[in-house]
A protein has these predicted regions:
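Short, charge-rich amphipathic interface segments used for partner binding and complex assembly
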Residues: 44-82
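Short intrinsically disordered terminal tails
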Residues: 1, 80-86
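N-terminal acidic leader/helix
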Residues: 2-42
């Protein structure tokens, strides 16, 4: 499961940053979920949802939520998926 290895740190002093981190983390978990399903079933729906997550990481909104480079986020998620066999 995706964890804070993407350097999404907790910031209890800034609840808005905490919320932004939670949104980014959930998008990563969603990507993993759909990639796992796509690996198993090869359904277009799962592929398009994966791409939707990738597009989110490159969106202006995601860039407002985190300072982490979207390519770094996606690369770390893909490495974790490969490590787990999907």
């Amino acid at each position: 499961m995706l964890n804070a290895n993407v350097n999404v740190s907790r910031d209890v002093e800034n609840p808005y940053k905490e919320l932004g981190n939670a949104i980014i983390l959930q998008a990563g978990k969603d990507y993993i979920h759909y990639r796992k399903r796509f690996h198993k079933h090869h359904k277009d729906f799962d592929y398009f949802r994966m791409k939707e997550c990738e597009n989110f990481f490159h969106s202006d909104w995601a860039q407002l939520l985190t300072d982490i480079d979207p390519f770094v986020i996606i690369e770390k998620i893909k490495k974790e998926c490969k490590k787990n066999g999907y």
